[in-house]
Amino acid sequence: WYPYVYDSTAYWNGELSDNLATDADVSSMSEQELGELKENQTAVSSGLMGAFKEQGLDSAKIDESTGTVQMDNNVLFAWDKADLSEEGKAYLDQFLAAYVPVISGAIEEGKVSTIVVEGYTDSAGDEAYNLKLSEERAQTVADYIKAGYPELANVIEVVGNGENNLILNGEGQEDAAASRRVEVRYVLKTE
């Protein structure tokens, strides 16, 4: 079950929106409602970018259109494992010190409804195994967040995607290292 809807039919200022993650279908929203949603999206993404910069997290990349932050599995996990490495815990501590205040504030202000932690793998190995590994890794990160920030426990969802949505290099070939990742995404509140 996915708690968010990708809607690529909404128009903002006459331009087609990017894959916007919201907790409802935005196709029936008024222009004013869409404008407010876009303002919320911009405010949260800008807040996260500023917080990441302050924490020295230049490697944290946020997709402003979807609210997705991508993390490097090579830092978080050993090969073929779902247990956080010590380096991964240190990275998450630094990441969460920047992420949580911004997202908690956005939740309190009614801008964000959900945090989705998604795991991905490369295409090496069995598809069913990869799906299970991606779910376990996403769950491990979600559990780590909940342990440090129990106030977020009720807004975190976990999704394993296995080898879906592979990252491709410049030649159109799979970038296996980049494909092995965990992403954290905020979902905009529409109601």
Label every model-predicted segment.
Residues 82-89, 113-191:
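Periplasmic OmpA-like peptidoglycan-binding domain that tethers envelope proteins to the cell wall
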Residues 41-63, 77, 81-118, 146-148, ...:
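Periplasmic peptidoglycan-binding/anchoring modules of Gram-negative envelope and division proteins
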Residues 1-66:
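N-terminal targeting leaders that direct proteins to extracytoplasmic destinations
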Residues 67-68, 166:
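A short acidic, often aromatic-flanked loop/helix-cap motif at beta-alpha or helix-coil junctions
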